[in-house]
């Protein structure tokens, strides 16, 4: 029974990682860049939801929508101001810029709201379902269900809509997409908007499970979600889901059966082993370069 309890907890944690990983996957798949400031967008989403629910006394759903709107706007602004001028720049320049944006958001949050922790309000039910000796909290069930709904909606959007087709075209060949009349810059901005909106959803779910908010809130979840995206295949949306769930389960099991202090090391060690065997990730495609 302890194993099942840890498995469910791992699925709940992994669902948060999966939602965050979808942001990494979409941005890399279309813009071919790694947005290492993505974790700090989660932090901004957490603060936005916190103030919407406590200072403005909004109900839960409007509060979440306010956080999503805030992060969506932030994602577009960051893309336009920081990343758009670097379209033709080297990967190193983009990486340095992403790290700079990350530090800017962290220090900006600390300047505005101080480093003192803030407690996210208990807006979701604290009850649990009982299956014999197994207890599953409603928050965990909501987290898992939200992840699945997000995954299905995003997959349908990418595969069944005209905008989704444009995104797939940009992912395959931006120059060809331009010749077909697709506004590539607009598609990239939309991708950042969607990824940042998902970061806000993940922020609320993360704070519902771990209610302490600080300016560094998004750092470790962001790193683990990036690990999940690489684990599953950085350009694969199903891979982001699979990677997130597996990383969550591995972390939960490592905490339960090995050591809480070593759990992160175990997660990254498993990632290295997988990449040695499958460099493209579990569901990633091997890329062949024509000479």
Explain the meaning of each model-derived region.
Residues 17-19, 57-69, 192-199, 203-269:
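Transmembrane alpha-helical segments in multi-pass inner-membrane proteins
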Residues 46-50, 68-74, 99-107, 146-155, ...:
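Hydrophobic core segments of alpha-helical transmembrane domains in multi-pass membrane transport
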Residues 15, 24-46, 60, 88-93, ...:
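Short, non-helical or kinked segments that cap or interrupt transmembrane helices
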Residues 56, 85-160, 187-190, 211, ...:
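Transmembrane helix-bundle core of multi-pass membrane transporters
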């Amino acid at each position: 029974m302890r194993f099942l309890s840890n498995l469910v907890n791992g699925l709940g944690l992994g669902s948060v990682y999966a939602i965050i990983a979808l942001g990494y996957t979409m941005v890399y798949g279309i813009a071919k860049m790694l947005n290492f400031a993505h974790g700090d967008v989660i932090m901004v989403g957490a603060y936005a939801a916190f103030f919407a629910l406590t200072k403005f006394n909004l109900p839960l759903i409007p509060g979440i929508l306010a956080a999503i709107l805030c992060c969506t706007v932030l994602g577009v602004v960051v893309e336009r101001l920081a990343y758009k001028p670097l379209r033709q720049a080297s990967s190193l320049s983009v990486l340095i810029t992403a790290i700079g944006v990350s530090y800017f958001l962290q220090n900006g949050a600390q300047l505005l709201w101080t480093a003192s922790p803030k407690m996210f309000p208990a807006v979701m039910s604290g009850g649990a379902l009982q299956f014999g000796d197994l207890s599953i909290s409603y928050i965990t069930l909501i987290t898992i269900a939200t992840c699945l709904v997000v995954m299905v909606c995003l997959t349908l959007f990418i595969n069944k809509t005209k905008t989704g087709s444009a995104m797939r075209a940009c992912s395959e060949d931006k120059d060809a997409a331009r010749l077909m009349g697709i506004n590539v810059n607009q598609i990239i901005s939309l991708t950042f908007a969607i990824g940042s909106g998902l970061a806000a959803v993940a922020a609320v779910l993360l704070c519902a499970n771990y209610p302490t908010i600080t300016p560094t809130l998004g750092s470790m979840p962001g790193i683990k979600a990036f690990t999940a995206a690489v684990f599953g295949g950085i350009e694969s949306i199903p891979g982001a889901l699979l990677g997130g769930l597996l990383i969550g389960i591995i972390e939960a099991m490592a905490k339960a059966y090995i050591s809480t202090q070593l759990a992160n090391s175990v997660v990254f060690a498993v990632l290295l082993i997988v990449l040695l065997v499958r460099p493209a990730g579990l569901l990633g495609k091997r890329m062949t370069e024509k000479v």
